[in-house]
A protein has these predicted regions:
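Active-site phosphate/pyrophosphate-binding segments
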Residues: 259-263, 267-295, 385-514, 587-607
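Glycine-rich oxoanion-binding loops at beta->alpha junctions
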Residues: 68-85, 272-286, 309-345, 492-508
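Glycine-rich phosphate-binding loops that contact phosphosugars or nucleotide phosphates
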Residues: 289-438, 518-564, 582
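Hydrophobic alpha-helical scaffolding
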Residues: 7-10, 99, 119, 135-138, ...
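Conserved short alpha-helical segments that host acidic/polar catalytic motifs at enzyme active sites
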Residues: 1-245, 249, 261-292, 331, ...
Length: 607
């Protein structure tokens, strides 16, 4: 969740650290700080607020400082409140470190340190970790780190500098990701490759338990046994321009408009002779045989793509599919075995709960397939098979294009699974693929609905509650629409299967409560219209979204959005844009920061 950057090289470390922290701002944070080497020790500057506040403080307090080695951090408070004292970096004795993660046994460690007369200054688990490393330090940094992490329980990504070993950064991780690169200007390490891309196109992922030593001349990585290890080098396929707004006010709007390209990039490489095909991904048909049950596990938006996948896979493949919240999966003693296919979905590939679910499934012998956007991520590496979504970098906290391509991959899995197991013919599969790629043109058409949805959004900003209704595929999409709205507009919102109205939900419907109803599926159209009539009769303000061929009584709704003509099976791809627009414009109208909603982080790397 937090942002980490470390630099040692030929250039001004303060400048490089601040630049890196600015690149990591999209992850969400409440304070920021840097620490860097000086002739008389380590100097630390940190503050509550944005990186711009830190930049001003550095300019005021350290304009003349010359340094070529340092570490920087953006903090999202987990242990201890938001304050300068609790901000990172933290120092204990000769150790200064930054940390992404949560140390679960920090209280026990704090008690052990207190018995030695050592007390923390802050309220954070991170300072305890620094104190433990310093307590273990007798002049050999790698030995101290190795001994200290043997005492830690939890997730962590540490970057560490020792005051008596200048111009050197040490790093180690467990759970929380770290990526690093060496160039002719020095070495850099970060929690996210977006902080590296201005330096290089090549990087490696630090493995769990491995210790990296960064100097201006090289990076040396040692495994758990202290043996030097040569990491696999990955290539970044996008550039810094892709991670900039490109003329849009917010990244979210830019990323909404990038969906057609992302969908084509995800679908077309998996079309061979018109058929769905994963051979280029190294995913053979053996994955889809001898499977009697599929479990999809994910968090948030990724889980909603799983709901879409469940609907399509069960519809076409006639095999039972469950969708489990990853944070619950491990604790319910799931029923999985060698005939289970576990599909994990994660944009970052580092979502802690999803990674834990994957590891449990592998322990129990399940086949595992991951759907991720980031190459070389932990979930991708640890899965038996991986299907990459080709969304490119997604900077806004609220996911848009990553969701759409996740749904696209779910559809592709359904098509291939059904074809391999004889549930659909090749002719059917070709038809599905053609319609799917044609639907991308309809997604582009939906992008022209911005003014219409903006006008409607302006009527929703004063609402305290907004409800979404749908059935089947529309219900699955309603869940995502509701999440998108609440996370960036701060308006309470819930999505309901429309048939559940009579079972309690309808008691919440009063005069002028907005209800957004999705009615794109002909097989349940009459039912959803009946539900709309129910809320309408109780005074709801109804926004109705339908297909092009739907016949709608004008008195049934306050606003009617008619989608471009689309095959109903693929209508959710088009309707997704409308729901994203509504959430975006409500947030903008309220004057909120669309890209960085409060209390949220882009990548949740702690449980």
């Amino acid at each position: 969740m937090c942002g980490i950057i470390g630099y040692v090289g030929l250039d001004d470390a303060k400048k490089e650290l601040l630049k890196g922290l600015q690149a990591l701002e999209y992850r969400g944070y409440d304070s920021a700080g840097i620490a860097y080497c000086q002739p008389n020790g380590i100097k630390t500057i940190k503050t509550v607020g944005k990186v711009s506040c830190l930049k001003d403080k550095v300019a005021k307090e350290a304009a003349d400082d010359v340094t070529t080695c340092g570490i920087g951090h953006t903090r999202w408070a987990t242990h201890g409140g938001v304050s300068d004292t609790n901000s990172h970096p933290h120092t204990a004795g000769k150790v200064t470190l930054i940390h992404n993660g949560i140390i679960e046994n920090y209280k026990e460690l704090q008690e052990e340190l207190a018995a030695k007369g050592k007390e923390p200054i802050s309220q954070t688990d991170t300072e305890i970790a620094a104190m433990v490393i310093d307590d273990c330090y007798t002049g050999d940094p790698e030995a101290a780190i190795r001994k200290a992490i043997s005492k830690l329980v939890g997730a962590y990504g540490f970057c560490i500098i020792f005051s008596d070993i200048p111009e050197t950064i040490y790093a180690v991780r467990n759970g929380s990701p770290l990526v690093a690169a060496h160039t002719d200007r020095g070495s850099i390490i970060a929690s996210d490759m977006v902080a590296l891309v201005s330096h290089t196109k090549h990087y490696f992922v630090l493995k769990e338990g491995h210790i990296a030593k960064l100097t201006k001349d090289e990076i040396i990585v040692k495994d758990e046994n202290g043996e030097v290890y040569g990491p696999y080098i990955h290539h970044i396929s996008w550039d810094m321009a892709s991670a900039k707004k490109g003329g849009y006010d917010y990244f979210m709007m830019k990323e909404i408009h990038e969906q057609p390209e992302a969908l084509r990039n995800t679908i077309r490489p998996r079309m061979v002779n018109g058929l769905p095909d994963f051979s280029a991904d190294g995913v053979g048909d053996e994955l889809f045989t001898d499977v009697n049950r599929i479990v999809i596990t994910a968090c948030g938006t990724a889980m909603h793509s799983g709901l879409m996948g469940k609907n399509m896979i069960e519809r076409l493949c006639r095999i039972p599919v469950t969708v489990d919240i990853a944070s619950e999966f491990r604790y319910q003693n799931p029923i999985i075995d060698e005939h289970t296919l576990l599909i994990t979905v994660s944009q970052s590939g580092e979502t802690a709960d999803t990674l834990a679910a994957l590891r449990l499934a592998k322990e129990r012998g399940a086949k595992t397939l991951s759907v991720v956007n980031v190459k070389g991520s932990s979930i991708a590496r640890e899965s038996d098979y991986v299907l990459y979504t080709h969304a490119g970098p997604e900077i806004a906290v609220a996911s848009t294009k990553a969701y759409s391509v996740q749904v696209a991959v779910m559809y592709l899995i359904a098509f291939r699974f059904a074809l391999v197991n004889g549930k659909i013919s090749e002719k059917d599969a070709v038809g599905f693929m053609k319609t799917m790629i044609d639907t991308v043109d309809k997604v582009e058409d939906a992008l022209t609905y911005d003014q219409q949805t903006e006008r409607i959004a302006k009527r929703l900003t004063s609402a305290t509650d907004i409800f979404f209704l749908g059935r089947g595929l529309d219900y699955a999409l309603s869940c995502e629409g509701s999440l998108k709205l609440k996370e960036i507009s701060y308006i309470h919102s819930e999505a309901y299967a429309a048939g559940e109205l009579k079972h309690g939900t309808i008691s919440l419907i009063t005069d002028n409560v907005p209800v957004i109803a999705l009615a794109t599926q002909p097989d349940v159209y009459a039912k959803i219209i009946s539900n709309v009539q129910e809320v309408r009769s109780r005074g709801a303000k109804v926004i109705l979204i339908t297909g092009a061929d739907a016949s709608v009584d004008a008195a049934l709704c306050d606003y009617h959005i008619v989608l471009p003509e689309t095959d109903p099976l693929f209508a959710p791809f088009v309707a997704t844009v409308i729901l994203q627009y509504l959430a975006y414009y409500v947030s903008v109208e309220k004057g909120l920061n669309v890209d960085q909603p409060r209390n949220l982080a882009k990548s949740v790397t702690v449980e």
